[in-house]
Structures are given as structure tokens and as C-alpha cells.
Amino acid sequence: TDQIVALSSTQAPKLSAQQIAALSTTQVSKLGVDNLKVLSYDAIEALSVSQAKALSSTQVSALTSAQFKHLGTSAIAALASDRIVNLTNDQVAAITTDQVQALTTSQIGNLSGAQLEKLTTSAVAALSASQIKAIDSAAVANMTTDQVKAIKVEALGGMSSAQISQLVATTQIKALTTAQVNALDSAQLK
């Protein structure tokens, strides 16, 4: 552990995926943010579920958006909700469709409106009905027109009446396609 803490910013980028995979969770938790920022994409991909869980909010927030894109889906799903809350807008914008599908409903529910509006339309299109339902209704107001259009018809069925009300209040309801409108039921429109 002392060796990990003592790593210099010139040594950290040289850590291989195998070396990262061999680190204990305690060692991972001791990696400094300056060292995390310079880890290779292969090293980031090598982080296990338990190692990802060991990362602090500060460590997760320190990852560049390019590094974040290389976190495995299991590692993403393992991040505690408070880590999700502290994601930077650039990290959220970098979330891939595979990563967004791996997010738990609890993690999705912890995205702020500002974070939600940074999801790409591809990421929004990959959200399931249960993930859509988990979005905080106040955060729905931050969705862009393109994001609203990107919601799959089958996922739109997951929206609550409170979420639909936010779309109406922000005039985003106009962004819905005919197929999306036809998929809404009377309970959602109350």
C-alpha cells in the first residue's frame, strides 16, 4: 500500500492492466487522483467490480471522460450511488450505450437534471422502461428535445404521470413522435 501511495506521476502511466488487476481494493483506494488521471485505458478496463467499489467519489470524478468510457459495464454497475451523483458532465456525456444499460435504476435515479441532459441521444435510446421510470421527475425537465425523441416507445411506457407532467410543463411533450404519443396510456396522462 505504501508503494501505491508513493507512485510518481511518471510511474503510474506505466502500470499494466495485469498490475492494476492484481491490486487489492485497499491499494486501489489509495491511488492518488493525479495517478488515476494518467492510467492507460487498458488499466482502467482492468478494474474489477470490487476495485471499482473501492474508488472514492473524488477518485471517480478525477477520471477523464476518455478513461470513464473504458470502465467496464460491471465496474460501472458497481459504483455506489454517491459516485454517480458526483460524475462530471463530461463523464456523463462519455457514457456508452453498453454502460448506460448496465446502470442500476438506483444509479439512474441519482442522476441530476444537469447530468441527465448530458447523456447522448444514443445513451437515452438505450434506456429501458425501468430505467426511464427511475429518473427523478424533476430531472426530466432537463431533457433536451433530441433526448425526448430518442426514448424508445417501449421505454416511454415506464414514464410516470409526474414525469409526463414535467414534459408538458417544459413543452418537451411537443418533441414526442406520433408513435411515442400513441404509446402513452391514460394513467400516464393524469
Please name every model-derived segment:
Residues 1-190:
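General marker for long, soluble alpha-helical cores
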